[in-house]
Amino acid sequence: MFKENAKKVETIIKTSEEPQSSRLNGFQRLKECCFIVGVLSSVLLAVALFTFSPADPSWSQTAWGGEIDNAGGLFGAWLADTLFFTFGSLAYPIPFLLAAAAWVICRKRGEDEPIDFMLWGTRLLGLTVLIMTSCGLADINFDDIWYFSSGGVVGDVLSSLALPTLNVLGTTLVLLFLWGAGFTLFTGISWLNIVEWLGDRSLAVLAAIANKFRGSEQETLEPQLDEFVEDKVSTKHVEDDQQDDETLPHLTAYEVEEPKEKAAVHEYPIYMPQAKSETSAVKPTPEPQPQRVAAVNATPTYVEPEPQLKAVSTDNVDPMVERTKQLNVTIEELEAAAQQADDWASEEQTSQSYADTNAVYQEQVQAKHEEVVEHDTPQLESSYAEYAQFAAQQEQQLHVEPTPHEEPVIDTRALDDITDHAEPSEHIEPTISDFDVVDEEETYVAPQPQSRSPEPQPMVQPQSVSQIQPEQAPEPSVAFEPAPQEVEVEEVQDGDQDVAAFQSMVSSAQAKVAATQNPFLMKQEQNLPVPEEPLPTLELLYHPEKRENFIDREALEQVARLVESKLADYKIKADVVGIYPGPVITRFELDLAPGVKVSRISGLSMDLARALSAMAVRVVEVIPGKPYVGLELPNMSRQTVYLSDVISSPQFEQAKSPTTVVLGQDIAGEAVIADIAKMPHVLVAGTTGSGKSVGVNVMILSMLYKASPEDLRFIMIDPKMLELSIYEGIPHLLAEVVTDMKDASNALRWCVGEMERRYKLMSALGVRNVKGFNEKLKMAAEAGHPIHDPFWQEGDSMDTEPPLLEKLPYIVVVVDEFADLMMVVGKKVEELIARLAQKARAAGIHLILATQRPSVDVITGLIKANIPTRVAFTVSTKTDSRTILDQGGAESLLGMGDMLYLPPGSSHTIRVHGAFASDDDVHAVVNNWKARGKPNYIDEIISGDQGPESLLPGEQMESDEEMDPLFDQVVEHVVQSRRGSVSGVQRRFKIGYNRAARIVEQLEAQGIVSAPGHNGNREVLAPAPPKD
């Protein structure tokens, strides 16, 4: 406070002085020139030293005809060589010391500054000692720099003189103490002050750590006036200070005591995941809660504002203390205090008069309250009865059926008679309801007439009586006498009846249209605003609040000891060597004793789960890169991994591929992503409710966050019509979402034809994959030589010239329920999928197959051989886990997105906690893409004809094969017998098996029988002939 005031006064004095001359005198000019020369010299020295080359000619090196690498030229090479030879590696700080010395000497313009020769002499002596001892220490402890000694010739001479006598340790100690003495001589800083400063910093750090662990705020030390304040003054505090002290947490005895030393217990290494967000340990101050005010007192109470400068009793305070406080107050605060004092004087008068008025008002309310309480209950009941009778009569008299769209006209002249019955002496203040104070629950609600007009009009309008509201009971002292009411209804003319009928028809039609356009139904066309961003943003996804992962070390160590004891019960000696807590599970790494097989622990997984009271325990037999066995236990409270957490991770942001997919987080909380282009196909399997469909949606959403329709396209097959139909209308789709399994075969066959077409184009351009194809098209377009379609022929299109080749996007085929597709369409789908899985990688066509029935008749060996990447959610048995992953473990998963990921080219599974995307997240991303454009469907994908390029090996076109002579007879037999098996046709017509099979295939091509199902039977599709 004193320093701020002193600066303020000094500033005022400076502004009152005459302006100084802008010209420099002679001595000032000389000092400024010396400063410029010093800075220039330091820059030249730095350039020469940092660009030194041993090959340059110098004082210690001779060279002829070579180029000089030093940026300072020949002079710089000689200068740097001389400094390195003299001081060694300590030549690098010389330019900085020279610039600092120039600044210190020339920073003041004063001419009449006395020169203290003693001070400058000690500084020069200290600088000399510092340089010599530093060179000596560098020569002893550091390696040589190029062909110079690390301490230069100065350090070499000192070490050669001291080493024979003092040895290395003694020489180092002597030079260190001399260095400390030189530092004090040069800077004038006492080492005692340095030690005190270090001690203060250390204590402050320890106090901060203690407060952080204790969870309390840091103490605020208030300055005390030890010289002036007496003991009796210290007991008096300002009210604000007392309130501040009350808000601070008080440290009790058990919070301050040090914990007692526990017995020596084995500590387990716990590897904590990296915290996502750090929160302050200081708890926020609780906000003041609003006080409840009684309902009787409806007038606000005037609260006098508290002044900023509190008046303290100065009876027992020394006058010096008061003067010290006045010195600490600034001029602005004194002016504000004076202005506020004037305001207080006027406000006191206003508050006094307001208080008097409020007191009179409270007396009136109390008197009126007592008057109401004195009324008996029978009087209240009689008032209710009279009012109910009056309301019933009014309802009977006013009950008239109006014609459509015509409001009844009520004669309001009779209403004036009602108001005359109200006595003017019964006037009550409308602002306060005395009856509500007596009993707020027994409120009478008057019945409302049903045939009134839409706009409510008051039936009774008393001038001196408080208006009766539905929520408020009438005053008991008011009695109404019913009067006959006359209602006049206007006659409806004949011409208006047609208009009313037409309007009713229009309104009914509009009501029907509004019923069909329910806002909760999926609309085909939506007017959505076009986003400005090229890709969807993170604001579309749900962002959970900041979660803190509280990990109890003692609980984890207790579980580790329990694991060791339970394994010991089964005669297995193992030690827990590492604990890795994660968001869903915690992995305990076990070091088995010599001779213990891993198979013994694997067979005890269910027993360990029972002994540890866990849902499931998974044993990781091999941890890559470690000689330990993993034991994965579920956490007591699992965390939800949201899609926004993984998409905002650096792993996903740094990925450049448009086919990047999100899987979730591993056991350490790190994001796990993959690239479908490198998989190149993925098989997803799991039971119902294990998170399989959510995982597929997360994969699709992650690709929508990375790729535009020019880079990626989808073909979606959804037999359940629920999971993938939500993506209908996004511009990434090549065709509508396939829900009919008969159309799914055409879609897969179109993919085979597209794959063959792409292979022909890539072979013509001499590239090996889609990425190289697109890059070559880009290079050709930039060079001004666009590439035309080499396989175009006249008649293929209406163009007269071959069209230009366009960029080929990646195509991802998503099948949500592969088992239903196999069941309906049959084995032909398996052949198409196998062919795509074998060859479609280079063509940029990738498959995502999901099934909830991981059996061998669905996931066949042909499919598993061509789809190396698998994702297994929770399954029922170990057999299903082996069907998917060729190993067990999926039966021990926890469900709700818990999965095992088998990456391509690896036999070790990775446990991943799948990311969660809600329906709102999916709708938000889908609507964002729908607003950007409409899809461009290709009709041939679903309803296209079978082309020759899409046929499987051995297939023939339908037109290339002639009908069998027995075809008509076989059709008649199959339609009548309703059996279309090959063996039945063979026995009935006594032909060979191959001929019968060929005829049945012709029947299938003509749509008479269906394709063979999973059991080999065919269904007769043609209707039966009519019976005579």
From Swiss-Prot:
GO terms for molecular function: ATP binding; DNA binding. Keywords: ATP-binding, Cell cycle, Cell division, Cell inner membrane, Cell membrane, Chromosome partition, DNA-binding, Membrane, Nucleotide-binding, Transmembrane, Transmembrane helix. It is found in: Cell inner membrane. It is a multi-pass membrane protein. InterPro entries: FtsK/SpoIIIE/SftA, FtsK_4TM, FtsK_alpha, FtsK_dom, Ftsk_gamma, P-loop_NTPase, WH-like_DNA-bd_sf, WH_DNA-bd_sf. GO terms for biological process: cell division; chromosome segregation. Residues 447-472 have a biased composition (Low complexity). One of its GO terms (cellular component) is plasma membrane. ATP binds at residues 689-694. Residues 422-479 are annotated as: Disordered. Residues 193-1028 are cytoplasmic. The keyword Cell cycle applies. It holds the Pfam family FtsK_4TM. The keyword Cell cycle applies. Residues 669-882 form the FtsK domain. The chain crosses the membrane at residues 35-55, 85-105, 117-137, 145-165, 172-192. SUPFAM superfamilies: P-loop containing nucleoside triphosphate hydrolases (SSF52540), Winged helix' DNA-binding domain (SSF46785). Essential cell division protein that coordinates cell division and chromosome segregation. The N-terminus is involved in assembly of the cell-division machinery. The C-terminus functions as a DNA motor that moves dsDNA in an ATP-dependent manner towards the dif recombination site, which is located within the replication terminus region. Translocation stops specifically at Xer-dif sites, where FtsK interacts with the Xer recombinase, allowing activation of chromosome unlinking by recombination. FtsK orienting polar sequences (KOPS) guide the direction of DNA translocation. Consists of an N-terminal domain, which is sufficient for the localization to the septal ring and is required for cell division, followed by a linker domain, and a C-terminal domain, which forms the translocation motor involved in chromosome segregation. The C-terminal domain can be further subdivided into alpha, beta and gamma subdomains. The alpha and beta subdomains multimerise to produce a hexameric ring, contain the nucleotide binding motif and form the DNA pump. Belongs to the FtsK/SpoIIIE/SftA family. Homohexamer. Forms a ring that surrounds DNA. This is DNA translocase FtsK.
